[in-house]
Amino acid sequence: MDNKAARLRRATRARKQIKELGANRLVVHRTPRHIYAQLIAPNGSEVLAAASTAEKSVREGLKSTGNVDAAKVVGKTIAERAIEKGVKNVSFDRSGFKYHGRVAALADAAREAGLQF
């Protein structure tokens, strides 16, 4: 099994457990160039908030969009947008990625900005 298939298998297993909880999901996806975060409703059919380094407003002031500093900005932005929508408690869905580096930086920044998970 290649790395991508293994990651997707881990992600599917984690999503199944999160759906049973019935909580809002903070989903993270990373590529070498960008990092994306979405806040998805418990039913899975509605995106409540989103932020990524592909957005011009987030990208301003960043030297690079594929590093830990950029992930921190995305984490802070998604937390602010979630709180505007009235969401404070979420389940963190790392999409099978290791909780390390950019994924961990995004999560820590979101926690510092007021999200609870």
Curated annotation (Swiss-Prot):
One GO term of the biological process aspect: translation
Top-rank taxon: Bacteria
InterPro entries with a match to the protein in the record: Ribosomal_uL18_bac-type, Ribosomal_uL18_bac/euk
Pfam families given in the database record: Ribosomal_L18p
Complexes and interactors: Part of the 50S ribosomal subunit; part of the 5S rRNA/L5/L18/L25 subcomplex. Contacts the 5S and 23S rRNAs.
GO MF annotations, alphabetized: 5S rRNA binding; structural constituent of ribosome
Function: This is one of the proteins that bind and probably mediate the attachment of the 5S RNA into the large ribosomal subunit, where it forms part of the central protuberance.
tRNA-binding in keyword set: no
Family the UniProt entry places it in: Belongs to the universal ribosomal protein uL18 family.
Gene3D superfamilies the record matches: 3.30.420.100
Alphabetical keyword list: Ribonucleoprotein, Ribosomal protein, RNA-binding, rRNA-binding
Keyword RNA-binding recorded: yes
Name of the protein: Large ribosomal subunit protein uL18
PANTHER family, alphabetized: 39S RIBOSOMAL PROTEIN L18, MITOCHONDRIAL, LARGE RIBOSOMAL SUBUNIT PROTEIN UL18M
CDD domains (alphabetical): Ribosomal_L18_L5e
GO CC, one annotated term: cytosolic large ribosomal subunit
